[in-house]
Amino acid sequence: SVGFKAGVKDYKLTYYTPDYETKDTDILAAFRVTPQPGVPPEEAGGAVAAESSTGTWTTVWTDGLTSLDRYKGRCYHIEPVAGEENQYIAYVAYPLDLFEEGSVTNMFTSIVGNVFGFKALRALRLEDLRIPPAYVKTFQGPPHGIQVERDKLNKYGRPLLGCTIKPKLGLSAKNYGRAVFECLRGGLDFTKDDENVNSQPFMRWRDRFLFCAEAIYKAQAETGEIKGHYLNATAGTCEEMMKRAVFARELGVPIVMHDYLTGGFTANTSLAHYCRDNGLLLHIHRAMHAVIDRQKNHGIHFRVLAKALRMSGGDHIHSGTVVGKLEGERDITLGFVDLLRDDFVEKDRSRGIYFTQDWVSLPGVLTVASGGIHVWHMPALTEIFGDDSVLQFGGGTLGHPWGNAPGAVANRVALEACVQARNEGRDLATEGNAIIRKACKWSTELAAACEVWKEIKFEFAAM
């Protein structure tokens, strides 16, 4: 007789376990599964659980040398997606022991590493992950977090203001530094390297760092406020990235920046550790995210990438603007904005949150609204994102007819007017335009900005 039962058997026999009670230490995943025609959802869900944990396509002799019951992923619930044909949400529980501590890289390699090319599935999307406190505690998380950042910058009770320097490619280092100085002098808190500014022939990184540091110190002296410029440390190797971060620290600047998806989670986590040890804030850009998260039925939802960033480490992350998008998008976006900032977030399917997430006092991340926004959007942005955010106006600062500094003044005046109105109990949703118009009366810079972008009409519903 044969020592073990060889052969291929259905995944659902081993990996679909609807009676399973999830443990507090399990990592839970919600997958949107689109099976191939003729594949039952239980088999598809079981296949996902198997391929992303202990399973392979056939029974193997070495299965007898370990305890599958202890280590296997389990598909414990399947529900059809309302309004979609042949789409299901498969819930999978993974034992904590399957994952290396403090490694976002390993977590993703396990959960989404292999299973997305699986033949039995037409498409697969990871919609959400529940990270148990036991695993959260193995991560350092953001270098500083929201409260420490405010204390470092001495800025309270309002969103922070930023601006991406444009044209993003082609300026010399000295002209780049000049643009930075004008923006900071006018009243912005931060300026930003574009995500694709690394170290190109027309502007090497060291020159840029030096001129930007000079701009920061001059603007601080002139305004009496703490200023920063997100110096992009992203590089072709981790060693080069660290070299840039070290140089930024030696210049005494407050913040550096990293592209966490193109740079990779391993590089990002190393940089985050360096930033915490050396008092640097870390701004995170999400370049490449849409490649992964844009398709509705395949890929990884951004809320998962956002959770991963909070674990890997970053003090700011770009998270969309909400403004002018569809209503549903707003709720979904605010769902992952809360996942980034709050300590404890309740399950809420209407906001796309599949699991209750307890971050057990891992520091929070400031969400960054950036892209196509201008002064008329300020009331909406203040209302939607609240104080713990960075509002970034690239063209909305540099496109001002009088130049960068007046563009910065216009944004700062608009923001202060909105914050004051909110604190006085006025409703930004209904009175936003009036608040901006009134502020124009005592700021010619704002009036000029409002004139340039007045065509873009903007109304939004109250929360």
Swiss-Prot record:
CDD domains: RuBisCO_large_I
Keywords: Calvin cycle, Carbon dioxide fixation, Chloroplast, Disulfide bond, Lyase, Magnesium, Metal-binding, Methylation, Monooxygenase, Oxidoreductase, Photorespiration, Photosynthesis, Plastid
UniProt-listed Gene3D superfamilies: Ribulose bisphosphate carboxylase, large subunit, C-terminal domain (3.20.20.110), RuBisCO large subunit, N-terminal domain (3.30.70.150)
Binding residues for Mg(2+): 192, 194-195
Positions with a binding annotation for substrate: 114, 164, 168, 286, 318, 370
GO biological process: photorespiration; reductive pentose-phosphate cycle
MF (Gene Ontology): magnesium ion binding; monooxygenase activity; ribulose-bisphosphate carboxylase activity
Name of the featured protein: Ribulose bisphosphate carboxylase large chain
Organism taxonomic ancestry: Eukaryota, Viridiplantae, Streptophyta, Embryophyta, Tracheophyta
Gene name as annotated: rbcL
